[in-house]
């Protein structure tokens, strides 16, 4: 059984991206800051931002609804609320559910878990193995 892998912090991602791109951390951090600000700006303007083959952010309105105050048991009205949502593409969902295992920082994919119609997953595997 694999040990639980912790999510990377923002600074760890900046460090790794800097190494992968062979650029200074300052440049990578500046790019990430700008990119995040751009995504927020576009989401506030267009109400939807697509991230290539990863997924999309979307602004949704959660309708007014009834709820129960857990302390008093009293029924309360929860007001309408605007919230951001993120939805992954079908391809990413397939990859996540495709029998991927991680051992000592290496990723292996069980090819037997794919259906014939898993185009995106097949493309991903081919490009990763080359």
UniProtKB/Swiss-Prot annotation:
The keyword DNA-binding applies. Gene3D superfamilies: IHF-like DNA-binding proteins (4.10.520.10). InterPro entries: Hist_DNA-bd, IHF-like_DNA-bd_dom_sf. Histone-like DNA-binding protein which is capable of wrapping DNA to stabilize it, and thus to prevent its denaturation under extreme environmental conditions. Keywords: DNA condensation, DNA-binding. GO terms for molecular function: DNA binding; structural constituent of chromatin. GO terms for biological process: chromosome condensation. Belongs to the bacterial histone-like protein family. It comes from Ureaplasma parvum serovar 3 (strain ATCC 700970). The lineage of its organism: Bacteria, Bacillati, Mycoplasmatota, Mycoplasmoidales, Mycoplasmoidaceae. It comes from the Bacteria. Disulfide bonds: none annotated. Coiled coil: none annotated. CDD domains: HU_IHF. This is DNA-binding protein HU. The keyword DNA-binding applies. It holds the Pfam family Bac_DNA_binding.
